[in-house]
Amino acid sequence: PTLDEVLQTIPNGRKIYIEIKCGLEIISPLLNQLSESSLNKDDVVIISFDAPVIKALKESKPEYKSLLLYSCEDNRNIDELIDDALKINANGISTDNESSQLLVDKILSSGLEYHSWTIDDSEVARKLIQWGSSSITTNDPKSLIQKI
């Protein structure tokens, strides 16, 4: 399906997370598509591993929520990651963290939101919710919801 077709399927009050996997060239066409859709800006979350993409998005349309994606395999200094997210005006950081409450606490104490991906284990999901994760991306939402 096209992005426009997908946007039309999102029920009122539900969120869509759009991951940008390419570069800056997508920002303008994406924002045009979003502005033509009937979605409320509060229901759109843009996510990317690419800090310049998030920065450009926030400079163009700061009202859209954005999350900087981070893979724990990258083993970055968390304070530097938080500083980078704050510099580009990201609303939060989303990681594949399953075991570090300290990481979650540091992100939340900086004023940023914390989000989780891709979590399919209900015990891990329950723990991340207790730690303060605002959202959890999963491959099996129905099963995960039933278990937690």
What does each model-found stretch correspond to?
Residues 1-74, 88-98, 108-110:
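Metal-dependent phosphodiesterase/phospholipase catalytic core, i.e.
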Residues 68-148:
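C-terminal active-site rim and adjoining tail of enzyme catalytic domains
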